[in-house]
Design a protein with these regions (language model features):
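Class I S-adenosyl-L-methionine
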Residues: 1-105, 109-113, 134
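Short, glycine-/small-residue-rich phosphate/pyrophosphate-handling segment
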Residues: 110-140
Length: 140
């Protein structure tokens, strides 16, 4: 079965990349992500595809069955306001689980990193996201 690994790369700083993420990136035969993310891994010798659009990524993977071990780069953590969720849902729907196994490797989220820098616990933090939204949350 072919492998797709959604890899959380944290803040993009190689010093904060997890060892599991590093190993996954180094073992890929295809690495996919936004250009700015791929540029951080220019030393990797596998093929690359620059995109952050779920439809384009799904199409590319399905049109290139020669790749056996695919890595998708996501900023931060794959489970915290991540594009990994929409990719996983859409790809599973389109591919129907016939050839690919999808797994996730977590990264350091901006929230945990920020709280660590401020030396505050984040277990009682209220989280809202304004990313891509026009709602005036600050004024309410």
């Amino acid at each position: 079965m072919k492998q797709i690994t959604c890899i959380g790369i944290g803040l993009g700083n190689p010093d904060t990349l997890t060892i599991a993420a590093k190993h996954a990136i180094e073992s890929c035969d295809l690495l996919i992500g936004a250009s700015r993310m791929l540029s951080s891994f220019s030393h990797v010798t596998c093929s690359t595809f620059a995109s952050c659009k779920t439809n384009e990524i799904c199409d590319y993977i399905l049109q290139h069955p020669e790749y056996q071990n695919i890595g998708l780069l996501f900023s931060g953590d794959t489970g915290f306001y991540s594009g990994a969720k929409s990719f996983t849902n859409q790809f599973k729907h389109r591919e129907q689980g016939q050839e690919y196994e999808i797994k996730h490797i977590c990264g350091i989220s901006s929230l945990s990193y920020f709280c660590a820098k401020l030396q505050i616990p984040w277990d009682d933090v209220t989280i809202i996201s304004l990313h891509g939204r026009e709602t005036p949350w600050i004024s309410t």
